Design a protein with these regions (language model features):
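A short, N-terminal "cap"/entry segment at the start of jelly-roll beta-barrel domains
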Residues: 1-27, 76, 111-113
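Conserved short histidine dyad/triad with adjacent acidic residue
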Residues: 16, 31-46
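Short beta-strand His + acidic residue motifs that chelate non-heme Fe in jelly-roll/DSBH
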Residues: 41-43, 61-62, 78, 84-90
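Glycine- and acidic-residue-biased ligand/ion/polar-headgroup-sensing regions
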Residues: 48-59, 64
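Structural motif
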Residues: 58-60, 67, 83, 93
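Short acidic-glycine-tyrosine-enriched beta hairpin
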Residues: 65-80
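Ligand-binding loop in jelly-roll beta-barrel domains
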Residues: 80-105
Length: 113
């Protein structure tokens, strides 16, 4: 069993987003992103399946043409290849997890011959 202390893994930077890779496996990647007030993750297209959850704080999540403000206690599913940006518009720190997994059809299943 491996317990990861999210507080110990926090990385905050004055000039850019903080980033910590928590899990790096063949079919799963989990990163923690930390934003100071007014910082953001610039718009980009997500290439794997992505699920986001806020650890603490509240962020504004732009996914495609939709915008939602979200705090802790929810999961936000981001469709494959969607444009996404995230902003911390409040006067408090924001920490969230980014969970990435490949498309199911990209996973090759080994069969016994």
């Amino acid at each position: 069993m491996d317990a990861i202390n999210l507080k110990e893994k926090e990385v905050f930077k004055k000039e850019d987003r903080g980033f910590a890779n928590l899990v790096e496996e063949e079919y799963l990647q989990i990163n923690q992103v930390c934003l100071e007030p007014s910082q953001q993750v610039l718009r980009h297209n997500v290439n794997p399946n992505v699920t986001l959850t806020v650890v603490y704080g509240e962020g504004t999540f732009h996914i495609g043409d939709e915008v939602t403000r979200m705090g802790s206690g929810k999961l936000l599913r981001v469709p494959f290849q969607s444009p996404m940006s995230i902003k911390n518009e409040l006067n408090q720190r924001l920490a969230f997890l980014v969970m990435k997994a490949p498309q199911l059809n990209e996973i090759q299943v080994e069969t016994k011959a």
